[in-house]
A protein has these predicted regions:
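Gram-negative bacterial Sec-dependent N-terminal signal peptides
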Residues: 1-24
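Outer membrane beta-barrel
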Residues: 25-42, 53-183, 273-277
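Transmembrane beta-barrel strands of outer-membrane/channel proteins
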Residues: 36-40, 84-86, 120, 176-180, ...
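Residues that define the transmembrane beta-barrel architecture of outer-membrane proteins
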Residues: 54-64, 100-103, 112, 155-159, ...
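Outer-membrane beta-barrel architecture
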Residues: 67-69, 106-108, 162-164, 271-273, ...
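Repeated loop/turn-to-beta-strand initiation elements of outer-membrane beta-barrel proteins
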Residues: 78-80, 113-116, 169-176, 278-283, ...
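Detector for outer-membrane/organellar transmembrane beta-barrel domains
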Residues: 229, 250, 258-407
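Outer-membrane beta-barrel "beta-signal"
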Residues: 414-416, 445-459
């Protein structure tokens, strides 16, 4: 249930002696809404000692957030719409340092001609899964454990145009998406990497630096001297991997790579959905061009069925990575590695894809996932659900990152009211295959179990 704050801005204008006639001729509404979710979560195999970790997290079933929805009636069945959404961690009150202040921010028009929106929005991959074959009937996904989002190419897109058209009965819904890259490139990453090479005390790197005339540049060759060029490549690998693994990063490269990864990327895609008589079917596809020139092609299809108290869903996702080809130059290699890191961030982490895809020339370039789930409304207030995900990764030249991953979660949600509920969930992750397949680089664990208990309120 959302708290409606009727025409706050118009009322303020009227109080100043302005806009009364406008308020009467153009009905509008402003809604302030939000979700506050906090949970205690315990996980195993954490850190180098592979111990247990118990902590309070700022979102177990849903990420805490608040937002503003605006609608203005333009007449003739048309209306203007705007949406702002800020996400935060309820345990600390802080926003996520790696995310923009507004996770969603868009404006648009809606009418008989369809719906056109512009801004930072959910991408079409997320849209089709969340609206058609979501993991749980009471929540599209569990925020503390969401391997399905690792296949959604970041889930949100900056600088996006989206056009949606539906049949009058909304049995058929289709959306097209295009976004602009807008000068998001790797130049800042190259600058920091060159600085690291020039500051390195590694004897081999210093020897190559001397052979290059005493200084590395973005256009400097990285393999021009036998037996020494590989050392330069390894230094670049180390700097980029350090940032990717969230370890110590004295060069400041970590922040630059994350900044590039959060920036606008060129995308094009769409989805189509059919829904009637409890059955929903959908499919979507999207290409993302990364800042260094690589392409990520993502596809998904699936469906769900509701019958009485039961909810069933199944889906398939495919990510195919097409890396940029790099020449024998520092800048070209940085482009290659930066794109790899951005992809790996999409694929990694126990809550978002579950295991590493690799950073370097032996990295994987293909990931597939199937998902199967069931939900049951045991009572008017109690919902239970179970979900299984199976992922397969391939394309690693030496097999280091080839393998499989299983994700399982059992969850129960009890509603005290329409706005307040309590939930509990048990999840388990297991990866197998090449030596590089780990849940996280700190623990290098291949299995992990989590228990989450939380409280959520919506207003």
């Amino acid at each position: 249930m959302q708290m409606k704050m009727k025409t706050v801005v118009v009322a303020a204008m009227a109080a100043c002696g302005m806009g009364a006639a406008l308020a009467q001729s153009t009905p509008s509404k402003v809604e302030l809404w939000g979700v506050v979710d906090a949970a205690v979560r315990h996980t195993t195999n954490e850190g180098a000692d592979k111990g247990g970790l118990t902590k309070l997290i700022g979102g177990g079933m849903s990420q805490s957030r608040f937002g503003i929805n605006v609608e203005e009636d333009l007449g003739g069945g048309s209306k203007a719409i705007a949406h702002l959404e800020h996400r935060f961690n309820a345990d600390t009150g802080m926003k996520d340092d790696t995310a923009p202040f507004f996770q969603l921010a868009y404006v648009g028009l809606q009418g008989p001609y369809g719906r056109l929106t512009m801004g930072r929005q959910w991408n079409v991959l997320f849209d089709v899964v969340a609206s058609t074959y979501a993991s749980f009937p009471y929540s599209p996904y569990m925020d503390a454990y969401k391997p399905e989002l690792g296949m959604a190419a970041g889930a949100r897109t900056n600088n996006a145009l989206k056009y949606t058209l539906a049949t009058p009965d909304r049995k058929w819904v289709g959306t097209l998406q295009y976004s602009f890259g807008e000068k998001n490139n790797t130049s800042s990453v190259q600058q920091y990497a060159v600085g690291a090479l020039n500051a390195s005390t590694n004897p081999q790197v210093a020897a190559v630096r001397t052979a290059l005339g005493g200084q590395y540049t973005a256009g400097a060759p990285i393999k021009n001297i036998p037996r020494l060029g590989n050392a330069v490549q390894q230094v670049i690998n180390g700097v980029v991997q350090t940032s990717a693994d969230s370890l110590s990063d004295p060069t400041g490269l970590k922040a630059k790579v994350e900044e590039v990864g959060m920036g606008a990327m060129k995308t094009f895609g769409g989805f189509l959905r059919y829904s009637a008589n409890g059955l929903s079917l959908g499919a979507g596809a999207m290409r993302t061009t990364l800042p260094g020139g690589s392409d990520l092609d993502a596809y998904t299809f699936g469906g769900s069925y509701r019958s009485g108290l039961w909810y069933f869903n199944a889906g398939y996702g495919l990510n195919k990575y097409k890396p940029t080809k790099y020449a024998n130059r520092v800048d070209s290699y940085i482009n290659y590695l930066t794109d790899r890191q951005i992809l790996n961030k999409m694929w990694s982490g126990q809550t978002n894809g579950g295991f590493s895809g690799g950073y370097f020339e032996n990295a994987a370039d293909k990931r597939q996932m199937i998902k199967l789930g069931v939900g049951y409304q045991a009572t008017k207030q109690l919902n239970i659900g179970a979900h299984f995900f199976r992922a397969k990764q391939s394309g690693s030249s030496d097999g280091t990152y080839n393998g499989n991953a299983n994700f399982m979660v059992l969850a129960a949600d009890y509603a005290f009211s329409k706005r307040t509920d309590v939930y509990a969930a048990l999840d388990h992750t297991k990866v197998s295959g090449g030596a590089g397949l780990v849940i996280d680089p700190q623990s290098k664990a291949k299995t992990r179990t989590g228990i989450t208990v939380g409280l959520r309120h919506r207003f």
